[in-house]
């Protein structure tokens, strides 16, 4: 082909490509009934978006919609907590991306109350529900099934030995006289439903008694004696005719739902595929739709609670890291699981082992050694970071881990409790000799600099800083919190120069000094990781960063002593002298490194072992036993030592730990951390750019 013709053809094709409009973005909403599909078609016409088009996919049930989204034949649906649980599991693998807000635009409320509504003319109490006629929103739904059935089991009013004996539906059908539970397979649970032919007992609006309004209509029509719905279901003009049935066997007015409810539960949420980025388009479309006056997301001429609940005032985007488990919360998630799988005898028995979460290969190696000599009392799990360990414990995949105060704050916000604290004071070992002691381990957060440099606490602007990790106490929360308060500036990265703060955005200024794994320089995934795979992570890592690159290092008061004067044989540390380093004091002066009690940034709580509240007792008992064997004064300390690290520093526990002290069961995380430190971390986390993804997920709502 002639060269000029070839060039002309290429240029023509290029021009054609450039002239073609970009591919149109589309959000396909799944409607699970004809009335929902009609509302969806209305929204197509009224919720116009210049960049994103809405289309509607009609299915006959929530399950069909979940399958359609999984198979990329639809993109989104708004469901209740029970379906969030189902959608988050295999094979669907969906995640919540937005939540309905029932509060106001300025004070969002993404929770609601599950209640039991009865007619005022009736007289029975909660404990007298047996043999009553019941109206439910739908099988597997939060207010209409999961909460009430879970509560009946908990109060032992309903007997169920588990799915191996009989189905839960069968057990419930024996408890109530007759019911309407849309979606149920047990005939007696569909007896009171009003749908015609194939629509009778359908888990969609094709069944008149489906959902909140439907369950209440079932009660109104005298097809039931009680309806399990949400706190806002009963119209205000009908409050005079109905009451709430309280679990304490009293009754209260409909308006007193905060003092008479079955549970406070997470809002309905929008589900989307977890594996792709379609979530961005869905969120963008819905945010724009809420600004359009003609776009009526939360009402419809075609019926009640179609696509979204009518009581919602807006849709709130969820933190990107949130999944079904974190959205629902550990307690509710496990309750739903128990309703699906039953409670096994093994779940009720006291654990005979502690599954310890490790955060690096070196920790796993030490833990494996511990497992071998523990007689089965210790097992090990693997995680990449402290936050991954917190998540493992929440999900029941691990039992315990030792955390720094910063991560303890996050753990507490996620529902874990402190059970044993590290104790460091070599000068007073009396507390280690008692089973219970009021003593509490503390250490000091300090700023370390090389002797002879001009840097001080008062002139940190533009200096190179080294941190243990984002979210940790001495290396981040204390220094960054103090600097943020003093400068009234949340943008710490712009205040200092280059930094290594493992856990930061790898492209940011806060990761510039990080080096990853020196043994694998081409593995960019290791750089700035909040784990041992980043050489500058942790106390020793932050100090190494100071030695090799930085101007100031934020660590604990023993860090210099543990890495100088021959204490650390690593190549980078073996020739270092402690006299070559000084402490930076908050008043702008400097002090010798042994003057930490006077010259420090804060006295902070010791690292602590955390676990779930229900596992506190076995974790403490096993650790007390293991400490008596392998602690500093252990009978078998020659075989293994819990508080020493052969192949690294501070593995599983800090090497300076003298013993573990039991923390009183009544001690809250806030009390253990101390009000001053707790308040400092809370203030620091108001800076959105410093708040971790897990913390954002755990604190998104309080239900």
UniProtKB/Swiss-Prot annotation:
Paired cysteines (S-S): 30-65, 40-56, 135-218, 180-193, 246-260, 357-389, 367-380, 414-698, 432-659, 466-545, 490-687, 500-514, 511-528, 585-599
Domain Transferrin-like: 27-341, 354-686
Binding site for Fe(3+) 1: 80, 112, 212, 268
Signal peptide: 1-19
SMART domains xrefs: TR_FER (SM00094)
Region spans: Connecting region: 341-350
Classification via SUPFAM superfamilies: Periplasmic binding protein-like II
Annotated binding of hydrogencarbonate 2, by residue: 468, 472, 474-475
Highest taxon above the source species: Eukaryota
Annotated keywords: Disulfide bond, Ion transport, Iron, Iron transport, Metal-binding, Repeat, Secreted, Signal, Transport
CDD domains from the UniProt entry: PBP2_transferrin_C, PBP2_transferrin_N
Subcellular location per the Swiss-Prot or TrEMBL entry: Secreted
UniProt: Fe(3+) 2 binding residues: 404, 443, 539, 607
Binding-site list for hydrogencarbonate 1: 137, 141, 143-144
Complex and partners: Monomer.
Family: Belongs to the transferrin family.
Name used for this protein in its record: Serotransferrin
Source organism of this protein record: Xenopus tropicalis
């Amino acid at each position: 082909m002639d060269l000029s013709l070839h060039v002309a053809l290429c240029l023509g094709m290029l021009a054609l490509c450039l002239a073609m409009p970009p591919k149109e973005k589309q959000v396909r909403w799944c409607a699970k009934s004809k009335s929902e599909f009609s509302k969806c078609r209305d929204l197509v016409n009224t919720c116009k978006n210049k960049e994103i088009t809405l289309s509607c996919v009609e299915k006959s049930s929530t399950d069909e919609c979940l399958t359609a989204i999984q198979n990329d034949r639809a993109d989104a649906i708004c469901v209740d907590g029970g379906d969030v649980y189902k959608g988050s599991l295999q094979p669907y693998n969906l995640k919540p991306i937005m939540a309905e807000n029932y509060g106001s635009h300025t004070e969002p409320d993404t929770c609601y109350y599950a209640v039991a509504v009865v007619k005022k003319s009736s007289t029975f109490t909660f404990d007298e529900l047996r043999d009553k006629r019941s109206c439910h929103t739908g099988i597997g739904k939060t207010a209409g099934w999961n909460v009430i059935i879970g509560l009946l089991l908990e109060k032992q009013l309903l007997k169920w030995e588990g799915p191996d004996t009989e189905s839960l539906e069968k057990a419930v059908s024996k408890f109530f006289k007759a019911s309407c539970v849309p979606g149920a397979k047990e005939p007696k649970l569909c007896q009171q439903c009003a749908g015609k032919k194939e629509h009778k007992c359908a888990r969609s609006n094709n069944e008149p008694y489906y959902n909140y309004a439907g369950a209440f209509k079932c009660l109104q029509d005298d097809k039931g004696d009680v309806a399990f719905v949400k706190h806002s279901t009963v119209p205000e003009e009908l409050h005079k005719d109905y009451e709430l049935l309280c679990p304490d066997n009293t009754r209260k007015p409909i308006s007193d739902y905060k003092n008479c409810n079955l549970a406070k539960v997470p809002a309905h949420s929008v589900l989307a595929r977890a594996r792709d980025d379609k979530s961005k388009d869905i969120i963008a479309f819905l945010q724009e739709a809420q600004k359009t006056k003609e776009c009526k997301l939360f009402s419809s001429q075609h019926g009640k609670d179609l696509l979204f609940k009518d009581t919602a005032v807006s849709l709130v985007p969820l933190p990107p890291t949130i999944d079904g488990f974190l959205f629902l919360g550990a307690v509710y998630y496990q309750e739903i699981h128990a309703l699906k799988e039953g409670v096994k005898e093994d779940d009720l028995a006291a654990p005979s082992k502690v599954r310890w979460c490790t955060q690096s290969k070196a920790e796993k190696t030490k833990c494996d050694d511990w497992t071998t000599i523990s007689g089965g009392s210790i097992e090990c799990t693997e995680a990449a970071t402290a936050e991954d360990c917190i998540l493992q414990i929440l999900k029941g995949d691990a039992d315990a881990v030792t955390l720094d105060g910063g991560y303890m704050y996050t753990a507490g916000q996620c529902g874990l409790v402190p059970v044993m604290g590290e104790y460091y004071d070599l000068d007073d070992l009396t507390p280690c000799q008692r089973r219970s002691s009021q003593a509490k381990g503390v250490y000091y957060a300090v700023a370390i600099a090389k002797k002879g440099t001009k840097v001080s606490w008062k002139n940190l602007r533009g200096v190179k800083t080294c941190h243990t990790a984002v979210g940790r106490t001495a290396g981040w929360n204390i220094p960054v919190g103090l600097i943020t308060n003093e400068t009234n500036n949340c943008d710490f990265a712009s205040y200092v120069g280059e930094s290594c703060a493992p856990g930061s955005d790898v492209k940011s200024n806060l990761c510039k000094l990080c080096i990853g794994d020196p043994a694998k320089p081409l593995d960019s995934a290791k750089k700035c990781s909040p784990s041992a795979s980043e050489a500058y992570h942790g106390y020793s890592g932050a100090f190494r960063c100071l030695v090799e690159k930085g101007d100031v290092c934020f660590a604990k008061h023993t860090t210099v002593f543990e890495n100088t004067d021959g204490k650390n044989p690593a190549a980078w540390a073996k020739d270092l002298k402690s006299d070559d380093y000084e402490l930076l004091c908050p008043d702008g002066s400097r002090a010798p490194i042994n003057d930490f009690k006077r010259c420090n940034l804060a006295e902070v709580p010791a690292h602590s072992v955390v676990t779930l509240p229900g596992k506190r007792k076995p974790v403490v008992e096993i650790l007390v036993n293991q400490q008596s064997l392998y602690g500093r004064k252990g009978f078998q300390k020659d075989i293994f030592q819990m508080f020493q690290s052969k192949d690294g520093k501070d593995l599983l526990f800090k090497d300076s730990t003298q013993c573990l002290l039991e923390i009183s069961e009544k001690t809250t995380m806030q009390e253990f951390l101390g009000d001053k430190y707790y308040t400092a971390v809370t203030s620091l986390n108001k800076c959105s750019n410093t708040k971790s993804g897990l913390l954002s997920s755990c604190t998104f709502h309080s239900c």
